[in-house]
């Protein structure tokens, strides 16, 4: 279960905690995150030792837990040295409040610096990163994936279906589904994805999925999970049946010829600068 202190101002953690009470602690894995402001004060956000220690305690209270399996830095903090952040997270592991720690949406340079701090001070290793990754956004392939593979860092991806674009619910030339994210003007992320180019790609990907006898969502999730460095994907669902259908991706292997066809459709060009 993936959560964060900032989701609905702590209400999401409290709600999740109320549900988890029914289950033995060893039967589930739960994570939370820290960074975004939780109040108006200067120490109410960021990745300082003070905020991490205080907010982790609050997250544990919210969820009624003694420890978290995973604790993420929700974003990088330009105002706090990475050394302070990583050493604090190591202290939280030693204190038994978290088992592993990770970072989300950090740059390759920031991840590399964190790994350097771990090596220099012989700390508990950076276990995992949580970036956005899906067929339409492959930024992490340029540098981050290789960096993680070389250093034994896992990758758990959020938004693997591109805010619903890769479910096939948004079709070229068709009205937006009633009640979908794209019908809300405030949700700029999905609306920015609904370009003519992306919708054309979706139509072609739907044909590939049809030929393989799976949904576009299963195809998109399997495409991510085939990467050795990807340990899991974080999928949201508004209905239980959506989750059940998407779970089929864990056992589906995309044939090599279909992978080649997908690459042609996506037409991805790595962002590599020439030197000299």
Where are these regions (language model features)?
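Short, acidic/polar
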Residues: 46-63, 111-116
């Amino acid at each position: 279960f993936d959560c964060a202190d900032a989701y609905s101002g702590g209400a999401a953690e409290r709600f999740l905690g109320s549900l988890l009470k029914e289950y033995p602690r060893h039967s589930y894995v739960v994570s939370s995150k820290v960074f975004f402001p939780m109040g108006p004060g200067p120490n109410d956000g960021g990745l300082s030792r003070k905020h991490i220690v205080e907010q982790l305690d609050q997250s544990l209270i919210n969820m009624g837990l003694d420890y978290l399996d995973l604790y993420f830095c929700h974003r990088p903090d330009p105002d706090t040295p990475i050394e302070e952040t990583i050493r604090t997270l190591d202290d939280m592991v030693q204190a038994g409040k978290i088992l592993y720690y990770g970072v989300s949406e950090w740059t390759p340079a920031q991840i590399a610096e964190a790994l350097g701090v771990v090596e220099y001070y012989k700390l508990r290793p950076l276990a995992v990163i949580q970036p956005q990754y899906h067929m339409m956004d492959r930024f992490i392939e340029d540098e981050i994936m290789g960096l993680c593979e070389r250093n034994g860092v896992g990758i758990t991806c959020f938004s693997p279906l591109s805010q619903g674009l890769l479910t096939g619910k948004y079709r070229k030339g068709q009205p937006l589904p009633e009640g979908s994210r794209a019908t809300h003007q405030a949700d700029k992320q999905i609306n920015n994805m609904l370009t003519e180019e992306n919708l054309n790609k979706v139509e072609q990907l739907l044909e590939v999925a049809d030929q393989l006898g799976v949904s576009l969502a299963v195809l998109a999730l399997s495409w991510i999970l085939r990467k050795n460095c990807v340990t899991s994907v974080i999928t949201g669902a508004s209905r239980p049946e959506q989750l059940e259908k998407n779970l089929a991706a864990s056992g589906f292997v995309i044939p090599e010829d279909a992978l080649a066809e997908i690459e042609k459709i996506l037409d991805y060009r790595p962002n590599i600068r020439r030197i000299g």
